[in-house]
């Protein structure tokens, strides 16, 4: 419903200098007049836009002052939601924020659902769906590069590309519809093949967008990087060295790490969701056993596995058991503790055990070899081909799947044209491709999908 007025706390709860209450809807200014008492400008609600007024939020029933505030007024359609919007900046503690929110709710507003402000911005035509989705990506960005990709999407770069693809598909559809409308005309073979070539050209454009979709997803969600190895091989020391802080407990006692430790770090703008696991071994300790099982589960989800070996002992039976678990993954082999002794591990033997692997000698304690490790991880992600300054990244799984489906229908249409199938069947594939592309920007999308997308947003956004 867009005929009611919504309100929510727009900043994180906790102690702070200020907190913001956001209100949007047809009655925002009317409710503001009830609960806000200006210090000077008594006619603050008049037609002027973009005002900030000093005053107090009060309980209109008792006249009690609730908080000293600044009130910002932004009239629709020149606001984020394209509706009348009021934002109240009050003191940032939990109590004043909640008391201000409660008095607004008692005077006619409804508590906003998660993402409802952004949803209204989309429904009112202020943003398209891809742009609206980028807002949550900006909020959740783990690196400067991830934020840059999201800002580009908010600015409409992806939408512009998708709209262009839709326009071209519509042009092809018009040509096919003309054939359907005039079946008595003999259509030259080269005309049909020409339309097929245009389909193939669009397919190549979509393939180009999809080529870096997995990389885009990594920038958005982080590269799931799991550190594995037998107990006491230096996994926790490696985590601490990469984070440049003592995040994990390090002792000489095997099995110190009994649970999974997860942190986010940035390597040249690439976010790593790095996970230190319990040492993989058979154990009777119940807590450690649970940690080992969780480690095995995480291995199945890993984008990259950092397999740590001990340079002082060579490859043990425990190491071979770990290798059996990771041999089908993308693995970096890290030979640790090279500062203590000469490396006793035969790299040729390792390569026989794991087909794809890069071997890097490190000392987690002395931070030797970490620069090479970081460079290798970065190159594995971007393959030396990508900068995020102006690139159009498909970082959202929903967008990726939509492009794949749209491309599949174009492939079917192209194949049908080459095989001279009836034009109305080709038309079905082209229409499907056009509609699926519209799902990305919201040109053709169901209400259920809209609700599902915005439910993932935070309240107040």
Curated annotation (Swiss-Prot):
Record-annotated TrmE-type G domain positions: 222-382
Localization terms from the record: Cytoplasm
Signal peptide: none
GO biological process terms held by the UniProt record: tRNA methylation; tRNA wobble uridine modification
Residue numbers binding (6S)-5-formyl-5,6,7,8-tetrahydrofolate: 22, 87, 126, 461
Binding site for K(+): 232, 251, 253, 256
Amino acids binding Mg(2+): 236, 257
Enzyme class: hydrolase
Listed cofactors: K(+)
GO cellular component, as recorded: cytosol
Gene Ontology molecular function terms on file: GTP binding; GTPase activity; metal ion binding
Cofactor binding mode and count: Binds 1 potassium ion per subunit.
PANTHER family: TRNA MODIFICATION GTPASE GTPBP3, TRNA MODIFICATION GTPASE GTPBP3, MITOCHONDRIAL
Record note on quaternary structure: Homodimer. Heterotetramer of two MnmE and two MnmG subunits.
Role this protein plays: Exhibits a very high intrinsic GTPase hydrolysis rate. Involved in the addition of a carboxymethylaminomethyl (cmnm) group at the wobble position (U34) of certain tRNAs, forming tRNA-cmnm(5)s(2)U34.
The family this protein is said to belong to: Belongs to the TRAFAC class TrmE-Era-EngA-EngB-Septin-like GTPase superfamily. TrmE GTPase family.
Record-given protein name: tRNA modification GTPase MnmE
């Amino acid at each position: 419903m867009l005929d009611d007025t919504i309100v929510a706390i727009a900043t994180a709860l906790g102690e702070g200098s200020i907190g913001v209450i956001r209100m949007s809807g047809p009655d925002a200014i009317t409710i503001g007049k009830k609960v806000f008492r200006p210090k000077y400008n008594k006619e603050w609600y008049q037609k002027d836009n973009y005002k900030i007024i000093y005053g107090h939020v009060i309980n209109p029933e008792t006249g009690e002052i609730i908080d000293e505030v600044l009130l910002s007024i932004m009239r629709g359609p020149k606001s984020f939601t394209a509706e009348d919007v009021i934002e109240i900046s009050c003191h940032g503690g939990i109590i004043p924020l909640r008391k201000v929110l409660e008095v607004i709710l008692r005077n006619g507003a409804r508590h906003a659902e998660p993402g409802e402000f952004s949803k209204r911005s989309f429904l009112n035509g202020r943003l398209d769906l891809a742009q609206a989705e980028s807002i949550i990506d900006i909020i959740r960005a783990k690196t400067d590069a991830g934020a840059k990709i999201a800002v580009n999407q908010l600015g409409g770069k992806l939408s512009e590309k998708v709209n262009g693809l839709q326009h071209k598909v519509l042009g092809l559809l018009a040509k096919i519809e003309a054939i359907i409308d005039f079946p008595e005309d003999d259509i030259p073979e080269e005309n049909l093949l020409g339309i097929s070539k245009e389909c193939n050209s669009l397919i190549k454009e979509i393939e180009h967008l999809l080529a870096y979709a997995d990389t885009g997803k990594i920038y958005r969600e982080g590269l799931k990087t799991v550190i594995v190895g037998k107990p006491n091989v230096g996994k926790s020391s490696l985590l601490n060295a990469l984070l440049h802080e003592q995040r994990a407990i390090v002792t000489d006692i095997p099995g110190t790490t009994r649970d999974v430790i997860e942190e986010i770090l940035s390597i040249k703008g690439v976010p790593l969701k790095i996970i230190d696991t319990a040492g993989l071994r058979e154990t009777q300790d119940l807590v450690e056993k649970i940690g080992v099982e969780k480690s095995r589960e995480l291995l199945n989800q890993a984008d990259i596995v950092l397999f740590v070996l001990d340079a002082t002992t060579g490859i043990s039976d425990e190491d071979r058991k770990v290798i059996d678990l990771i041999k089908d993954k993308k693995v970096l082999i890290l030979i640790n503790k090279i500062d203590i002794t000469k490396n006793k591990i035969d790299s040729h033997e390792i390569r026989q055990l794991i087909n794809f692997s890069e071997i890097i000698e490190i000392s987690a304690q002395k931070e030797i070899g970490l620069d090479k490790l970081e460079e290798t991880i970065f190159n594995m992600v971007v393959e030396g081909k990508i900068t995020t300054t102006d690139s159009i990244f498909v970082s959202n799984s929903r967008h990726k799947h939509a492009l794949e489906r749209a491309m599949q229908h174009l492939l079917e249409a192209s194949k049908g044209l080459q095989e001279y199938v009836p034009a109305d069947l080709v038309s079905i594939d082209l229409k499907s491709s056009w509609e699926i592309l519209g799902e990305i920007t919201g040109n053709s999308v169901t209400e259920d999908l809209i609700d599902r997308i915005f439910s993932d947003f935070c309240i107040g956004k």
